[in-house]
Structure formats: structure tokens, C-alpha cells
């Protein structure tokens, strides 16, 4: 049984329960922005340090698979320790030119109690040619930079 004391952050799930795809070798990425100190590749491995946009505002991250994939699990981890804001993201999958929503969600970051958002999606997707992640870092229109701690796919 997993347990935690009230008021503490939710622990990051163990990294070994899935056979995560090696996205570095089976996909290419398209990005709307990237901070050189926090490259996109850093979000594609557990504990990699994460990606951050170089510019404020809405950002799009796209994974284009070299060959169509069967996907069963998608993990997104967002972390914000500095700024209170409400973030929204849209995760979509595409196959044969048709795109479909997986999730559209909002999350309120509020330090020190709510700084980590972990999303686990159990899916049964076949023939996936791309995954798109659109992040609106602050739905109120502030000058926040989007970031993504982890994007793991099995």
C-alpha cells in the first residue's frame, strides 16, 4: 500500500513498471520553442531534468514516429516551484492524418503545496504516427514559460 502524510507532495511513481520506448531513436521532435539550458531530450528520460520553453506563452511539442506505434501508457510530469498559475494542456494522437484528443486538463500550481502534476494515461492506441502536446502555461495570459519534467511513453 502506498501512503503519504496529508499536505505532502505526491511521490513520483516508480520508473520501472513500464517498458518505456526509447524516443531518442524511434521519433523526431518538432518544437515551437526550446531553452538551450533545458532541451526537449531531457524530458524523454526518467530524471533527465526536463524541457523548458525559451519564450513565454502557449507551446507545442510534437513527437513524429519513424514507424507507426502501438501505445499503452503515457506519463506526463509537470513541475512548477516558483510561480502560482493555472496551466492547461491538450494531448492528442494522430494516425493516417486524423488526430484525436487523449486529454485536455487544467492544473493549479501553488507553491509550496501544489507544485507537481503527474498524469498517467492508460491507452490502447494502434498505428500512432505522432503525439502532440500543447501547453498553455498560464490561462490568465501571464508571461509564464511552459515546461515539462517528463514525457514517457510505453
Region annotations inferred by a language model:
Residues 43-100, 120-154:
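Aromatic, loop-rich ligand-recognition surfaces of beta-strand-rich domains
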Amino acid at each position: 500500500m502506498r501512503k503519504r502524510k496529508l499536505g505532502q507532495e505526491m511521490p513520483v511513481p516508480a520508473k520501472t513498471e513500464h517498458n518505456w520506448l526509447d524516443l531518442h531513436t524511434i521519433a523526431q521532435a518538432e518544437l515551437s520553442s526550446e531553452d538551450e539550458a533545458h532541451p526537449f531530450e531531457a524530458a524523454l528520460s526518467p530524471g533527465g531534468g526536463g524541457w523548458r520553453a525559451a519564450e513565454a506563452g502557449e507551446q507545442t511539442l510534437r513527437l513524429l514516429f519513424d514507424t507507426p506505434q502501438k501505445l499503452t501508457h503515457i506519463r506526463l510530469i509537470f513541475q512548477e516551484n516558483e510561480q502560482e498559475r493555472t496551466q492547461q494542456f491538450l494531448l492528442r494522437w494522430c494516425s493516417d492524418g486524423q488526430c484525436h484528443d487523449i486529454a485536455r486538463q487544467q492544473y493549479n500550481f501553488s507553491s509550496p503545496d501544489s507544485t507537481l502534476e503527474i498524469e498517467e494515461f492508460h491507452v490502447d492506441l494502434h498505428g500512432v504516427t505522432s503525439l502532440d502536446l500543447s501547453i498553455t502555461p498560464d490561462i490568465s495570459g501571464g508571461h509564464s514559460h511552459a515546461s515539462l519534467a517528463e514525457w514517457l511513453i510505453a
